[in-house]
Amino acid sequence: MEFDPVKINTSSIDHVTILQYIDEPNDIRLTVCIIRNVNNITYYINITKINPHLANRFRAWKKRIAGRDYMTNLSRDTGIQQSKLTETIRNCQKNKNIYGLYIHYNLVINVVIDWITDVIVQSILRGLVNWYIANNTYTPNTPNNTTTISELDIIKILDKYEDMYRVSKEKECGICYEVVYSKRLENDRYFGLLDSCNHIFCITCINIWHRTRRETGASDNCPICRTRFKKITMSKFYKLVN
């Protein structure tokens, strides 16, 4: 049985997208909840809603040697901490349609999907995930030029952001010398990018520098190379992503 996108109903609750695949003639109903995490630019899929047994099996699997090794390698390859490869939404009245264990899509496609014994459900799940990613990553469009990105391009884009995150998490501010991603306050864990050079600063330090220069009547120069800048861009990465 082939996957048919026409049979997908899409809705959302808060930051969760809910995909319902309904094929009544074949008595197939599958609900997939997906979170797109903007902090590490990836997707997390609710395996509890697919089948509660999958969540229990996953928790047991990741405690075994094979599971631990896979999680370690995935964390290294994506630059995402192991603890951030999964997310949980609590079961309460507000979250009754979206609660459960969400895991990195790589774990679903390459590990969990093999635990599903129904090959038709396997095929539909894979189709739903690929369909969602393909339809939620687009190139900029103009009225006369509508272009969607291929699945291969999507993977390249995700890899690009993951590489950017991996490099960014090691960068230190050139003023306070702290690792930007390790600063105590969450609002400080951003870079302040200058339009004049590539020196690295956290957003807090460079804003204080900029404000002090303005108050004293001094020119807006980079604290390191003294090149004049016109603007500061707040960014989660150490440089702008094209």
Swiss-Prot record:
Give the UniProt subcellular location, in the record's own words: Host cytoplasm
| Gene that encodes it | OPG021
Q: Which keywords are on file for this protein? A: Host cytoplasm, Host-virus interaction, Metal-binding, Modulation of host cell apoptosis by virus, Modulation of host ubiquitin pathway by viral E3 ligase, Modulation of host ubiquitin pathway by virus, Transferase, Ubl conjugation pathway, Zinc, Zinc-finger
* Function summary: RING-finger E3 ubiquitin ligase which catalyzes the formation of both 'Lys-48'- and 'Lys-63'-linked polyubiquitin chains. Plays an important role in virulence by acting as an anti-apoptotic factor.
Give the catalytic activity: S-ubiquitinyl-[E2 ubiquitin-conjugating enzyme]-L-cysteine + [acceptor protein]-L-lysine = [E2 ubiquitin-conjugating enzyme]-L-cysteine + N(6)-ubiquitinyl-[acceptor protein]-L-lysine
Q: What is this protein called?
A: Host range factor p28
Q: What is the lineage of its organism?
A: Viruses, Varidnaviria, Bamfordvirae, Nucleocytoviricota, Pokkesviricetes
Q: Which Gene3D superfamilies match?
A: Zinc/RING finger domain, C3HC4 (zinc finger)
User: What are the EC numbers?
Assistant: 2.3.2.27
Q: Which residue spans match zinc fingers labelled RING-type?
A: 173-226
The record ties this protein, via InterPro entries, to: E3_ubiquitin-prot_ligase_p28 (IPR016398), KilA/APSES_HTH (IPR018004), KilA_N (IPR017880), MKRN-like (IPR045072), Znf_RING (IPR001841), Znf_RING/FYVE/PHD (IPR013083), Znf_RING_CS (IPR017907)
Give me any GO biological process, just one: symbiont-mediated perturbation of host ubiquitin-like protein modification
* Domain topic, free-text comment: The RING-type zinc finger domain is required for E3 ligase activity.
